[in-house]
């Protein structure tokens, strides 16, 4: 899943994606600069 913009928000102490990257992993996606569970 590719994010439109980079978001480095952490959820439960774990980043939903790498810093500066636009690709989310681990069942998360970026939406409006926040991590949301897919």
From Swiss-Prot:
<protein>
    <recommendedName>
        <fullName>U-theraphotoxin-Aju1a</fullName>
    </recommendedName>
</protein>
<dbReference type="GO" id="GO:0005576">
    <property type="term" value="C:extracellular region"/>
</dbReference>
<keyword id="KW-0929">Antimicrobial</keyword>
<feature type="disulfide bond">
    <location>
        <begin position="3"/>
        <end position="24"/>
    </location>
</feature>
<keyword id="KW-0295">Fungicide</keyword>
<keyword id="KW-0960">Knottin</keyword>
<feature type="disulfide bond">
    <location>
        <begin position="7"/>
        <end position="30"/>
    </location>
</feature>
<comment type="function">
    <text>Has strong antifungal activity against C.albicans MDM8, C.krusei IOC 4559 (MIC=2.5-5 uM), C.glabrata IOC 45658 (MIC=2.5-5 uM), C.albicans IOC 45588 (MIC=2.5-5 uM), C.parapsilosis IOC 456416 (MIC=2.5-5 uM), C.tropicalis IOC 45608 (MIC=2.5-5 uM), C.guilliermondii IOC 455716 (MIC=2.5-5 uM) and A.niger (MIC=5-10 uM). Lacks antifungal activity against B.bassiana. Has no antibacterial effect against Gram-positive bacteria M.luteus, S.epidermidis, S.aureus or against Gram-negative bacteria E.coli and P.aeruginosa. Has no hemolytic activity against human erythrocytes. Probable ion channel inhibitor.</text>
</comment>
<dbReference type="GO" id="GO:0090729">
    <property type="term" value="F:toxin activity"/>
</dbReference>
<dbReference type="InterPro" id="IPR012625">
    <property type="entry name" value="Hwtx-2-like"/>
</dbReference>
<dbReference type="Pfam" id="PF08089">
    <property type="entry name" value="Toxin_20"/>
</dbReference>
<feature type="disulfide bond">
    <location>
        <begin position="16"/>
        <end position="35"/>
    </location>
</feature>
<keyword id="KW-0872">Ion channel impairing toxin</keyword>
<keyword id="KW-0800">Toxin</keyword>
<comment type="similarity">
    <text>Belongs to the neurotoxin 12 (Hwtx-2) family. 03 (juruin) subfamily.</text>
</comment>
<dbReference type="GO" id="GO:0031640">
    <property type="term" value="P:killing of cells of another organism"/>
</dbReference>
<keyword id="KW-1015">Disulfide bond</keyword>
<dbReference type="GO" id="GO:0050832">
    <property type="term" value="P:defense response to fungus"/>
</dbReference>
<keyword id="KW-0964">Secreted</keyword>
<dbReference type="GO" id="GO:0099106">
    <property type="term" value="F:ion channel regulator activity"/>
</dbReference>
